[in-house]
Amino acid sequence: MSGSQSRTRRNPKPYAALNTLFLNEVNRKHQVKRIEDLPRQAVETDMCVDKLSPYIVKLAKNGFRFSVDSITLEFYKPKTPLKLDDAEEWAQQHLNQDLRAVATKLQPAKSLKTVFNPDDIGTDYVDLVVLGEALQDVPEKRDTVGELPTTFGPYKRYDDLSKNIKKLKPSSAAKSRERETFQKSLSTVVHDGTFAVNHGGTVALETIAQPIEIFYPPFRRISEALEDPNFQPGLDLLDVISTIVLKAGIIAQEDNYTETLRKPLMEVLEQYLGKVYTSGKHSADGLIIPLLFIDLKLAFSEGGCDPIVQAEYSVLQRWNEEELKPLREKCSCPTLILAGGGPNFVLLGAVWADRFIVQRLSDIICLAQASTSVDDHIYKAARFFSAIKLGINDLRAYYKDVRTRKMEPLQPNTPHPRFFPYPTKFKCRQSKETISFRYLNATDDDDSRNLVYLAQTQEPQPRKLIVKFSDRYGYEAHQLLADAKHAPELFYCGLLDGESDVLDSEKAKGRFRGGAGGLYTGPMRMIVMEYLEGKNALQTPREEWPPTAHAHVKATIDQLHEAGFVFGDLRLPNVIFADGDTKLIDFDWSGKEGDVFYPHGLSENAGWVEGVKSFRKIEKKHDLEMLEKHFPAS
């Protein structure tokens, strides 16, 4: 034994192993891979940390199946031993977080022998944590896309939800424990902004989704009516609201709640609004479409059951019934939900495209009379129900059209209109003609927040387009660069009707709220632009960048600055190499310096420079520093 041990010490293995965790969204399962070809002498001599970069690039390509930008790599060593079995939970907790509290950042010039003992690495612990930008397969919001996948994701999500929702009982699914389970599964999740967390406190599944109005624009009319001080309630509604206000404050046990409040409320609502749905009840006069679904309880979360959640599942189950299948396969099933707990009511809108999305259209309104001064209270309540009636009338007209609409049948591997936003035409700025188009796919199909789509015109010679949806967009900066051929040609930027361009319509414009830290207010807009055949700088290995990349990006940024604009988001995905040229895309944050602000929710590990922070003004110096950070001169 002693001889064997001696020989091992005299002739150690020529290579050292290094267990490496690449902390990035592209490593979705947070796997730890091992660098096995690192020369042992590299760890025992004065080799520097930055010499690990080629090994990381190779490991990413062969072990993780993606490429990384070596210039963006950062190396960390966990401060406390991190077992391989605990790596996934640790990664979930610290993804997109500042690691310095839990790991030591290794300076590039630091000697490896001062960091690692070759006899202690490559065991049952994570030795190295690496941050860096991936060059492909990144779940980023992009304005360029690849080919349509073999399996069409939207159909699979729709079909999985259709199969699994049959197994649910809404009253049970709305209780917290069951709800948490369902919000962790792609096949049962409702995208309403409520989410479950894993044991480590990380979000189990993203439930933020696209605005429902891009699938059904009239939803916007309801929220606009409620926000408009000039929106007047129908006079014929005052008697109805007076009756509701008298009964809304009743405190009752479940046994007599139906007789004292729920039934009278339903009677007056149906008198004014027409047939409605409640949990466990279907109206019947031929094919009844659930325009408005109502769920009323003694109180919100009474009995551990949330009436909003119960109504969500009830709407989904109703639309999943066989008799509604022909209609369901033609559209995104827009529906109104009125949920109440005691005297408190809230109005929501729901759509079922590829995902089931529910979003609020109103604040919570209390209908109980608490003051002797009641006129203003009745007026506000009347406006609330008048807005609901407005929404129901819009839905009736919509479904009348859908029922007679001719449409291709739903197929598993074919893009279908029901999965995509409603707008399919726009008035072109250049030709002044109305151009129709069809959607091909989302640029990031896995991302529930995706607002960028690849489309194709319906012309004798079809051409591809990028169709984007955003309330905030720097159309002036985009147009300036498009005119100089430094950005995609801009065909339309305006309201979802495809006719109200910001160049001609004041309603299509938005603004930043004064004194509110740059919070933006404005309508949802559709932006239609040229599709560029190319790859962005994140998808392209740095050695394949055009030699003029830095000069072109700098000249483009200088042109914006000279005109008083800032770009705001000069990261790798927003620079496109196409047709031998370098162009900028994604002008969501662009605008006049001093007028535009960084938005909510900036990721700390997205490669920002100092001074970039949510709700702070975007400055020209930020653009220039981002230029040197991400597009340095060679």
Q: Where are these predicted regions, by residue range?
A:
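Charged, often low-complexity linker/regulatory segments
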Residues: 140-264, 379-382, 386, 390-407
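A short, conserved, highly charged catalytic patch centered on acidic carboxylates
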Residues: 212-329
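Nucleic-acid nuclease catalytic cores
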Residues: 304, 316-362, 579
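Juxta-kinase regulatory segment immediately upstream of eukaryotic protein kinase catalytic domains
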Residues: 378-442
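ATP-binding glycine-rich loop module of kinase domains
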Residues: 427-488
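Conserved structural core of kinase catalytic domains
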Residues: 470, 479-550
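C-lobe/activation-segment region of protein kinase-like
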Residues: 546-547, 578-634
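Catalytic-loop of the protein kinase fold
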Residues: 561-578, 584
